[in-house]
Amino acid sequence: MVDFVVDLTDAELVADTLWSLGVVAIEEISNDGNVTLRTSMGENPQDTIASLRDTFPHVEVSTVEIDRAVADTWRDFAEPTHVVNDVYLVPAWKDAPPGSRAIFIEPLDTFGLGNHPTTVLALRLALRCVQPRSTVFDFGSGSGVLSVGAASLLSCTCSAYDIADSAKDALTVNAAENNVTTCNWIPGFPANTVDAVLANILAPVLIAESLNVMQTTQTGGVIILSGMRTEQAAEVLRHYSQCSEITRDELDGWTAVALKKN
């Protein structure tokens, strides 16, 4: 387990950022003027910690040993997450709602269930804007929710990448959970352009990698940007000058935007 000690005024935003990075549970422990956010990040949490510190450099970080059975109690309380219409993201050990089109997700020790607003928004816009049977690159793939969702629901051929070492295993597991054979892992941006890029990652990375994201997308292709707080969207979009906005959606203070590459 990893402890993040933050000022009381920053606790909600830091916790929200941890959710967006894919953690599956957070325990909040109140101290004198501070809050400790305790969460599991698997065996190699360094990349996720580095991403958080890019945005919150003053956060104090430490590791603690917790009994595995205690750490996994969150699984008893996990529930399906509604995305849009009849589409749900469902924990792999739970039953799907009757009549739903379900994407089953096993987060392993590192990633989330896809129930954070950034993932819900990204998948919602992908289902709305990406054409069936497209080629798709999932940038910041985490547990593979977007790749597996696009492959399963839109018959897309997907490649995925995330800086976290365990993301490759998560993609493999969740593709198998959903009988998907058209998702593959690659060690970075693809060599060839694709019809659509799904980028669900923090705003500083969306900005830093904007040229790579645009260069990876075919002319006329779709870019889905998620991981932005609503107040960050304008600054992120300023770096995507080769694109025009198709639509956007908001949920719980987060914004996702669908763009067309001009």
Which residues fall in each region the model found?
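Hydrophobic residues in well-ordered beta-strands that form the structural core
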Residues: 90-91, 160, 225
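SAM-dependent Rossmann-like transferase core, predominantly class I methyltransferases
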Residues: 70-132
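Amphipathic, non-transmembrane alpha-helical secondary structure
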Residues: 16, 120-127, 207, 211
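N-terminal auxiliary segments of SAM/dcSAM-dependent transferases
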Residues: 1-97
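S-adenosylmethionine
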Residues: 163-262
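Conserved SAM/SAH cofactor-binding pocket of Class I
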Residues: 109-190
